[in-house]
Each structure stands twice: as structure tokens, then as C-alpha cells.
Amino acid sequence: YGLELDNSIKADQEGHLEGDKTWVVKGDYEYVSKEGK
């Protein structure tokens, strides 16, 4: 899934079930700091 919030936070995540009980999840995020970076 991916999402973008009003406060300039963006996140993407994906995952899959490996075996019976193990989730493998990968993702990334980005945001703009108060300094604008």
C-alpha cells in the first residue's frame, strides 16, 4: 500500500507471507522536515 498525508509524509509498503507465520515486509518513507529538507 502507499499513502500520502497532509503533513508531507509519504509511505509505501509491500509484503508477503512466507511459510505459515512469517511476514516479509519492505517499505520506505519520506518527509519534509521543519527546515524544508
Swiss-Prot record:
PROSITE patterns: CHIT_BIND_RR_2 (PS51155)
Residues in the signal sequence: none
Residues covered by the Chitin-binding type R&R domain: 1-37
InterPro entries: Insect_cuticle (IPR000618)
Keywords noted in UniProt: Cuticle
Disulfide-bond pairs as recorded: none
A GO term for molecular function: structural constituent of cuticle
Role according to the record: Component of the cuticle of the larva of flesh fly.
Protein name: Larval cuticle protein SC4
Organism in which the protein naturally occurs: Sarcophaga bullata (Grey flesh fly)
